[in-house]
Amino acid sequence: ADNVAPALLGGFTLIRSYNPLDIIPVSCPDDLYSAIIHPDIELNTSDARRVLKTEVSFQNAISQSANTAGFMVALIRGDYDLLKRSMSDLLAEPYRTQLIPGFDAVKNAALKAGAVGCGISGSGPSVFALCQGETIARQVADAISKAFNKIGLLNEAFVSKVNAPGTRVTDYR
């Protein structure tokens, strides 16, 4: 559901529960764009899960919960400053970065180019950056792509408005 819900519904979704399934669409600012860069490497979800810790510190759990709450409030309010402060993954990113060559340089390039925040998309290897406006998103996508190219890693870059509609039929012929 964590991958299917956003694809079907579009934008951001919060899965509050899996049993029973409780999916909540979350509004976001009209000018929020995402730059997605997919490096030409294979990364199995099982390998990405294997590097995660089975236990987290109490402080990291509290901080991650606060970041998640801040992220959701920032989306709903359109508060880019809060969004920037809330885009810190303390649970997965510190361990999964080792699986994506050049990730730290890529993230730095994204932030330097104007991204609100940058992280690993799902279990990777794709990297996403949230940006205020399409122009900045295209600049960020270019900066990330160049950072991957610099270490010899081919990649594909995509830019999309975040609150785009979900899956829909555009032509039924």
Residue spans for each PLM region:
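Short loop segments at secondary-structure junctions
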Residues: 17-20, 40-41, 132-135
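Glycine-rich, charge-dense phosphate/pyrophosphate-binding loop(s)
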Residues: 75-173
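Alpha/beta catalytic cores of group-transfer enzymes, especially the acyltransferase/condensing modules
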Residues: 1-32, 118-120, 128
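Short acidic, glycine/serine/threonine-rich loops at helix termini
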Residues: 10, 18, 48, 169-172
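Acyltransferase
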Residues: 26, 31-116
